[in-house]
């Protein structure tokens, strides 16, 4: 099948793109508003775009009412955020933070997560996350209806148990989760791994 983009409706394009560009890592972004309200939200339009220094990218849509999501507003206001990685142990809590809450709601409390003080940014890390990247805003780029945010990592926090003495990642201990299309996710460990 072929789909001419200009002749294909938005719902179909959304379904195709999200179902075909897989698996996608999940950036679980924690921010703080200028008024001190904590926020967490997961994004699967996410990846790393540079390694030295590390630069991460998230792409965020608007709310259904076409207003900015809290993550975008907070990042543009404070110029900083933390990208936490999702592992199997926190998967259910991540799903809670993916629900749309009013700006005054603290998602840490809603999901039963612990804010952990960051070293270089005001936004807290998620203590339960095995990996966190403290980021300062590198660049903001609007792309059609999306808000693309690039963050330069200032610090990478990694749980000791997932790295060996040579700093290789043990995926059986990390147990990362990725996003597929629809309501499907994938475990990026165990028999799913292919070694070449």
Swiss-Prot record:
Keywords associated with the record: Flavoprotein, FMN
Keyword presence, Flavoprotein: yes
UniProt keyword Signal, yes or no: no
Cofactor(s) needed by this chain: FMN
Record InterPro entries: Flavin_Rdtase-like_dom, Split_barrel_FMN-bd
The family this protein is said to belong to: Belongs to the flavoredoxin family.
Protein name per Swiss-Prot or TrEMBL: Uncharacterized protein aq_928
């Amino acid at each position: 099948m072929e789909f001419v983009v200009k002749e294909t409706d938005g719902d179909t394009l959304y379904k195709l793109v999200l179902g075909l560009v897989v698996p996608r890592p999940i950036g679980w972004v924690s921010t703080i508003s200028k008024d001190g309200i904590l926020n967490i939200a997961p994004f699967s339009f996410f990846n790393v775009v540079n390694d030295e220094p590390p630069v991460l990218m998230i792409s965020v849509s608007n709310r259904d009412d076409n207003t900015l999501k809290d993550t975008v507003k907070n990042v543009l206001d404070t110029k900083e955020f933390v990208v936490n990685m999702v592992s199997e142990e926190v998967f259910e809590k991540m799903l809670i933070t993916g629900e749309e809450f009013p700006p005054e709601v603290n998602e840490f409390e809603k999901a039963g997560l612990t804010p952990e003080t960051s070293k270089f940014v005001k936004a807290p890390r998620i203590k339960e996350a095995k990996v966190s990247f403290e980021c300062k805003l590198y660049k903001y780029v609007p792309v059609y209806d999306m808000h693309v945010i690039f963050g330069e990592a200032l610090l990478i926090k990694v749980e000791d148990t997932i790295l060996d003495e040579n700093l290789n990642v043990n995926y059986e201990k990390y147990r990362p989760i990725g996003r597929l299309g629809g309501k499907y996710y994938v475990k990026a460990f165990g028999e799913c791994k292919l070694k070449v």
